[in-house]
């Protein structure tokens, strides 16, 4: 599960912890990235990570079949470097959202998608829980930048995908439903 903030990661971790008997939770910050990936490859589990997990993590094959992206990965505008860049673009008469923030978020989202499909034979589901990809005018730019695939907006399609792969995951039972209910209630 990819997050854009540690606060969101921690809230979801604490909500899912009581439900994690079948799939241990591997939380960024409690283990090194390398040890988390090793554990993940050996034992069915769930990785909860932020920035460093959006890129450079390579888990090809059957070990990774689902990536959940909780929120579109826009840089936080109040972070000093981002804030300075936005102000610089504004002074130059350039729209910082369209010409800086949006392109960076699109690249980051593509990187998040890339965690799932590393080789031609890899298959899986990316679940994007941020409705802005559908509800905002810039959502089409995100969609156009994503790899080809089947896009759906209901869990039935996800269940069918895993069923057809011969793996009836508990993906659509308490854990994912809990994430989705947290998302709709708290806006992860």
Residue ranges and their predicted role:
Residues 1-188:
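ASCE RecA-like P-loop NTPase motor cores
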